[in-house]
Amino acid sequence: MATVNTDATDKDISTFKVTFTLVVSGIECITGILGSGFITAIYGAEWARGKTLPTGDHIMLMLSFSRLLLQIWMMLENIFSLLFRIVYNQNTVYILFKVITVFLNHSNLWFAAWLKVFYCLRIANFNHPLFFLMKRKIIVLMPWLLRLSVLVSLSFSFPLSRHVFNVYVNSSIPISSSNSTEKKYFSETNMVNLVFFYNMGIFVPLIMFILAATLLILSLKRHTLHMGSNATGSRDPSMKAHIGAIKATSYFLILYIFNAIALFLSMSNIFDTYSSWNILCKIIMAAYPAGHSVQLILGNPGLRRAWKRFQHQVPLYLKGQTL
């Protein structure tokens, strides 16, 4: 059985590392919570009023709500793993954090992939029968695909609760330079089971996202070149919008892949628990949903207008509270 074993003591993490990790990841998580919470509130309010959400808005609601839960959970895990290490390294608590983290991450990756597939089918233009068929059927199939994604995410995250992670704390490790003892935190990870269940849960949405993003970039690039050849000029608003969409899609594609890699490295315990590399993985994992939530608000005209109204109303509300 291929396992990865790591151990750490309280001395292995400095006050600076704890503070740095909590501050940076905390800012990212709070940004993501505000962004995802705002999107959830906007579309959730429409859904609560009995309105039928368009397919794109429905995906956005599912994605933003799952991201809201993910960022809250990630913030809790960072606090427990850095400040309450004895509690966090109890086997049941540790496994609970890992399984829910994987489930929420897998759900997010699926929803993000479906959002990109939907926009690709709506915006891109390719003369292929399969592409036209998917274009016609996607609106009908999407609600079922979203439900299936949650089920698949659960199916490949719940098995991680058994025979994958094992952690324990030894509180009586002698210190050679003195007569005292120290706590040592041990972790074992079954890499065979982790790689299987993690890859099975992430492989399909990852390929879907890369393929949809690539097709969308190619279609937008081709259309941009066509507009340029017609001498519309780089100052044309439509061309600027296309170039902006290409940049945004490329940026999110890179962030999506980095997040998937960081999640796997963090889950596998390849790096020491409190090493700089593991801290970097935590920061990347928090940056991905926060960055994309901000991009969704800035890139969506309706959300952008709602955000401006919200920014205008908050000072008025606070001013009214002080009177």
Curated annotation (Swiss-Prot):
Record keywords, A-Z: G-protein coupled receptor, Glycoprotein, Membrane, Receptor, Sensory transduction, Taste, Transducer, Transmembrane, Transmembrane helix
Annotated localization: Membrane
- Main location group: membrane
Q: State a single Gene Ontology molecular function.
A: G protein-coupled receptor activity
Q: Name one Pfam family in it.
A: TAS2R
Stretches that traverse the bilayer: 15-35, 59-79, 101-121, 141-162, 191-211, 248-268, 277-297
Record's superkingdom? Eukaryota
Tell me a GO cellular component.
plasma membrane
What ranges does the Cytoplasmic topological domain annotation cover?
Answer: 36-58, 122-140, 212-247, 298-323
Residue positions the entry lists as glycosylated: N170, N179
Residue ranges in the Extracellular topological domain are 1-14, 80-100, 163-190, 269-276
> What SUPFAM superfamilies does the annotation carry?
Family A G protein-coupled receptor-like (SSF81321)
Q: How does it sit in the membrane?
A: Multi-pass membrane protein
| Role this protein plays | Gustducin-coupled receptor implicated in the perception of bitter compounds in the oral cavity and the gastrointestinal tract. Signals through PLCB2 and the calcium-regulated cation channel TRPM5.
Other comment = Several bitter taste receptors are expressed in a single taste receptor cell.
Question: Hey, which family's this protein in?
Answer: Belongs to the G-protein coupled receptor T2R family.
Protein name stated in the entry: Taste receptor type 2 member 40
Organism of provenance: Pongo pygmaeus
